[in-house]
C-alpha cells in the first residue's frame, strides 16, 4: 500500500526541504537533514484528493490540504520516528514512539556510525490488539488507528502532565502495557525510556521503514 510520509523539524528550526511526499510500496525516498537537527517522521494512510482538490488522509493527517505538510505535525493517533542528530558526528538519539498512538508499523535503523547503533522497530500491527475505547475506525468498520490513553481520556495519569509529571507519579498503565507488549522497543508512554531510546555516533544515515 502507498503511504504519504511527513516530516516535522522541532525546536522552532527551519523545516526540511521535503516536508512530505508520496511513497509507493517498495519505493524509497532520500531526505536530507542538517546537523544538528531534531524532528520526527510519520506515515499518513488512506489519503485522497476530493473534487475541490483538497488532499486529506484518514490517519496521521497534517491538515495542510495538500501532500506537503509545510511545518504541520501529524494529527494523532500516529506512529512516530523521532531522531535527534548531533553536531559534528556526536551522539544521535532515535526511537519509535507510540506516545501519540499508533497508525502503522515503523522502524528506524542507522546505516554506518559507531557505538550501539541498533535498529528500533515497532513491526506489529497494534490496531489488531487495540482495545475498543482506543479504536479509530474507517467507514467500513475496520480499525485504522489506535489512540493513546492520553488522547482518549485526557487524564494526567495517562498523559504524565501535572500533578503526574514525574516517572514516579506516572507509571505504566494497562493501556501503555498493551503498546509495550506489542512493540517492546517503542516508547509506549512519556516515561518509557528504559529500553526505548537508541543511540549512535559518527554521523550515520538512517533508514526509516513503513510496515517493516
UniProtKB/Swiss-Prot annotation:
Subcellular location: Secreted
Disulfide bonds: 47-57, 62-69, 117-200, 122-183, 130-146, 150-159, 160-170
Major localisation: secreted
UniProt keyword annotation of Disulfide bond present: yes
Matching InterPro entries: Osmotin/thaumatin-like_sf, Thaumatin, Thaumatin_CS
SUPFAM superfamilies (UniProt xref): Osmotin, thaumatin-like protein (SSF49870)
Pfam families linked to this entry: Thaumatin
Record Gene3D superfamilies: Thaumatin (2.60.110.10)
GO terms under cellular component: extracellular region
Domain of life from the UniProt record: Eukaryota
Entry keyword annotation includes Methyltransferase: no
Keywords of the record: Disulfide bond, Secreted
Protein family per UniProt: Belongs to the thaumatin family.
Name the UniProt record assigns to this protein: Thaumatin-like protein 1b
